[in-house]
Amino acid sequence: MGLNTDTKINIVADFSSLSINKQIPKVIEEQVLTALSHYPELSDTCIRFFFTQQLKASVMAARPVIKTLLRSRKRRAYDILISPVFKLKHSIEPIHQVADAVLIGWIGHELGHIMDYEQRSTIGIARFGLLYWLSKTYIRKAERVADTFAVNRGMGSYILATKEFILGHSELSQRYKDKIARLYLSPDDIVELVAKLEEKTQDRREKILAEEAEIADDIATENL
């Protein structure tokens, strides 16, 4: 499914500038570039988008490339792992055939994680990984931070489309839906967040993001 004309107009005209230091599968290139157009801060960041069978409990995952963590932050690299298929109860669906808005929202959420990583030191990223593994409370807060980054950069409608797709899909397992409902922002939360951010100045929005990251660390520490 291709992007409609209005969506294409919203993509930065020079696609080549969005592709700098990026590796993107051709089949999802338009959706990835649309998501990247909302993150000018990542224009020079090395990010590799690739399909993998390694993901068992997620559709996508953003991870720093370990060997680059000893470099300066500007020289770090990240991977966004993508499951090639969307597993349903009785069938599978190629991920690139999911509705554009849904796929863009998924990618935008993972780019939100990279924005979070970019603000952390190497030790901070290691701590993030440990706490994410140990604490479900930390997972929820970390996912809220990623969604907040995306919403703050104008991706609210995409993030909402992704959440509604997951929670309303009749062929998705209830276990997966329960996990999403438990650990991630609900559609109502996203609508409320969009409304709040629209009322704030840019400086206030950035302060909200910083507060979200601090809350995630504080709550996780309290629960260890």
Predicted regions and their residues:
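A metal-dependent hydrolase signature that marks the N-terminal structural subdomain at the beginning
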Residues: 1-75
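A broadly conserved amphipathic alpha-helix scaffold signal in soluble, globular proteins
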Residues: 112, 148-151, 164
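Soluble non-cytosolic domains of exported or imported proteins
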Residues: 22, 26, 97-98, 102, ...
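An active-site-proximal "capping" alpha-helix that borders the catalytic cofactor pocket
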Residues: 139-156
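Long, well-structured alpha-helical subdomains associated
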Residues: 155-224
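Active-site scaffold of zinc-dependent metalloenzymes
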Residues: 61-100, 117
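Short alpha-helix carrying the canonical HExxH Zn2+-binding catalytic motif
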Residues: 97-115
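Post-HEXXH active-site segment of zinc metalloproteases
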Residues: 101, 116-144
